[in-house]
Amino acid sequence: MPEGPEIRRAADNLEAAIKGKPLTDVWFAFPQLKSYQSQLIGQHVTHVETRGKALLTHFSNGLTLYSHNQLYGVWRVVDTGEEPQTTRVLRVKLQTADKTILLYSASDIEMLTPEQLTTHPFLQRVGPDVLDPNLTPEVVKERLLSPRFRNRQFAGLLLDQAFLAGLGNYLRVEILWQVGLTGNHKAKDLSAAQLDALAHALLDIPRLSYATRGQVDENKHHGALFRFKVFHRDGEPCERCGSIIEKTTLSSRPFYWCPGCQH
């Protein structure tokens, strides 16, 4: 599943294609959304927001399209009139004079009013987004030490969208390697220095991945700073200590770590 940096990059691509342009055609696959088609023609997308792995497309009439890609959903940008060759099922089409954005295969799609936006169950549940520029290491540290999270093992906590939205497995693996910890630690047991390092890494690594065009299927980004230090590198030497990186399973997900420098 794409993680926060990939979702934000997808949002950037959608904004670049149609933001501020009048919609000339709107189509939804689901019957409960059909009534919104005519309401949106002539309106425009004001901005595309991410909340962890959910995407919010805001329209000029106050409505917001909520979509969560889950495992299979994918957005595409095409020239208007172009019909991509794909076996995927089209769910949403938002068309402008020159560009069209298409959502395929997703099933978790809703139209929300401003009031519904504040009460939506998923949006209520997710924690602060790691890519929100207003989120600080101090706030992250407070969350780590809060009664709700301080006794949770990092193996599960760093996958829990209620803790911080936008984290996922490759980020969990890279963050824990960066701070030299294994997944069985809890925030309540860390030293002040370890807590500080973790709070910074929880923001720095997702933001670096986003800023340097972090693609999960590329091991190295040409000319960029972000690359996987342990993710998908089992059997290779750790660049920090030389020990061989191992692969195991933590919280039902593949976990990569260095037994030499993660304790």
From Swiss-Prot:
Documented EC number(s): 3.2.2.-, 4.2.99.18
Alphabetic keyword roster: DNA damage, DNA repair, DNA-binding, Glycosidase, Hydrolase, Lyase, Metal-binding, Multifunctional enzyme, Zinc, Zinc-finger
Gene3D superfamilies: 1.10.8.50, MutM-like, N-terminal
Positions of the catalytic residues: 2-3, 53, 253
Binding site for DNA: 70, 125, 169
CDD domains in the cross-refs: EcNei-like_N
Residue pairs linked by disulfide bridges in the UniProt entry: none
A single GO molecular function term of this UniProt record: zinc ion binding
Record's keyword annotation contains DNA damage: yes
Cofactor note: Binds 1 zinc ion per subunit.
Stated role: Involved in base excision repair of DNA damaged by oxidation or by mutagenic agents. Acts as a DNA glycosylase that recognizes and removes damaged bases. Has a preference for oxidized pyrimidines, such as thymine glycol, 5,6-dihydrouracil and 5,6-dihydrothymine. Has AP (apurinic/apyrimidinic) lyase activity and introduces nicks in the DNA strand. Cleaves the DNA backbone by beta-delta elimination to generate a single-strand break at the site of the removed base with both 3'- and 5'-phosphates.
Homology family: Belongs to the FPG family.
Protein's recorded name: Endonuclease 8
Source organism: Escherichia coli O17:K52:H18 (strain UMN026 / ExPEC)
